[in-house]
Amino acid sequence: MDRNAVSPRRILLIGYGAIAAELSEALRQRGHMVTTLLRAGSRSRERVPEGVMIAATLDEAATFAPELVVEAAGHEAVREIVPDCLSRGLPVLISSIGALHDDLLFERLAGLAGSHGGRLLLASCALGALDYIRAARAADGLSVAYESRKPPAAWAAELRALGHDPEALASPVTLFEGTAREAAAAYPQNLNVAAALALAGPGFEATRVAVVCDPDATGNTHSVRAQSEYGTMAITIANRPSPTNPKSSWIVSRSLLAAVEQYFSPVVML
């Protein structure tokens, strides 16, 4: 017996990139009905398989009567599409939570969710132990440090911009050190994990981030260290890259699947 199984639901995906495509396939395998929101002329339309409906506008998607919206299209979608979803009273699960480094945007989305009966759901995606960070967020002197360590294939363009040959990199290169707010703004497609830590814990300014490209890395590694009056936490997660997008971890789409099914489940682990 699968204690997490839920009855078929109607899910609207914003976008159809690598993560959304993996999530769509997993949802459909479990019997859920999927529609994707893609503007007319989007090249992603060519990748959408039979059995997945396509809507060009949110008005068109509304005829599908989605029970949950899942954003998997990047910061621009969070700014431009998610507000309209929330104003319609729809629950929205956001994967590109790095967009919320913009405090005004976060306040706007939270306000829309509260005033229209929707819900703003923030995905943890590739990172574990956020429950510990949330529990310690009120502690005096909470410090949180995060390091992202990925192989050169994940940072090829960034390495070339710095004058490095990704295929000939001999030693680790630190691409970034700073706050989670700076990281989310600098790498909108890559550091949603840093934003998740900041939102769960001490905030974007107090969460420290380092981004390292390592030729010896065999996967996408996330290391987190948190310290407070309650104790010390240190965790390292080595995720395999997505087969279709080396910048992202393969587990992300499965994390979103788990979040979708937990949302509808009568039993919820908090």
Role assignments for model-derived ranges:
Residues V6-I11:
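Extreme N-terminal starter segment of soluble prokaryotic enzymes
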